[in-house]
């Protein structure tokens, strides 16, 4: 059947982007467009629940915001999940964020989901599902301890 990891993103403990993993495969990622009218500092928590059936190691995560690399820190690593965190500063009205385990252009074009988050109007939308089944949870009700961003 193939590998299928689970990949979620929690933003500021308030918004959850769920099921960002591909239907099959060892890659995970997404493209985000965030619209805001003033400076914002957003805390991102990236949660990977690995499928160990065919792999020995979980791929790392790379994040770019408006073509600038974002420092990503691994904060927890267990058999059941791997958690990374990053802080992204929004300076522009529109911020494009790329999050990925593999930056192959074809994955962004046809496989990774594309999500729009309008922080002004609080409208959050999955623009393109591509080869995944993402959904947005807002407000977030953490149902696992590691989803809380205390």
From Swiss-Prot:
Family label: Belongs to the orthopoxvirus OPG027 family.
TM helices/strands, residue ranges: none
Keywords: Early protein, Host-virus interaction, Inhibition of host innate immune response by virus, Viral immunoevasion
InterPro entries: Poxvirus_C7/F8A (IPR004967)
This protein's name: Interferon antagonist OPG027
Record has Protease as a keyword: no
Any one Pfam family match given in the protein's UniProt record, by short name: Pox_C7_F8A
Function: Inhibits antiviral activity induced by type I interferons. Does not block signal transduction of IFN, but is important to counteract the host antiviral state induced by a pre-treatment with IFN.
The keyword Zinc appears for this protein: no
GO BP terms: symbiont-mediated suppression of host innate immune response; viral process
Induction pattern: Expressed in the early phase of the viral replicative cycle.
Lineage: Viruses, Varidnaviria, Bamfordvirae, Nucleocytoviricota, Pokkesviricetes
Superkingdom of the source species: Viruses
């Amino acid at each position: 059947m193939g590998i299928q990891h689970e990949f979620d993103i929690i933003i500021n403990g308030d918004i959850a982007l769920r099921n960002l993993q591909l239907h099959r495969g060892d890659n995970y990622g997404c493209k985000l467009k965030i619209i805001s009218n003033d400076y914002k500092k957003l805390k991102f928590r990236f949660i990977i629940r690995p499928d160990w059936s065919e792999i020995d190691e979980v791929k790392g995560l790379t994040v770019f915001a408006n073509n600038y690399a974002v420092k990503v820190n691994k904060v927890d690593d267990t058999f059941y999940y791997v958690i990374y965190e990053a802080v992204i500063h929004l300076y522009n009205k529109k911020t494009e964020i790329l999050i990925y385990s593999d930056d192959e252009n074809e994955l962004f074009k046809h496989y990774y989901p594309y999500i729009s988050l309008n922080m002004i109007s609080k409208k959050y939308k999955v623009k393109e599902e591509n080869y995944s089944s993402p959904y947005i949870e807002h407000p977030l009700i953490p149902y696992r301890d590691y989803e809380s961003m205390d």
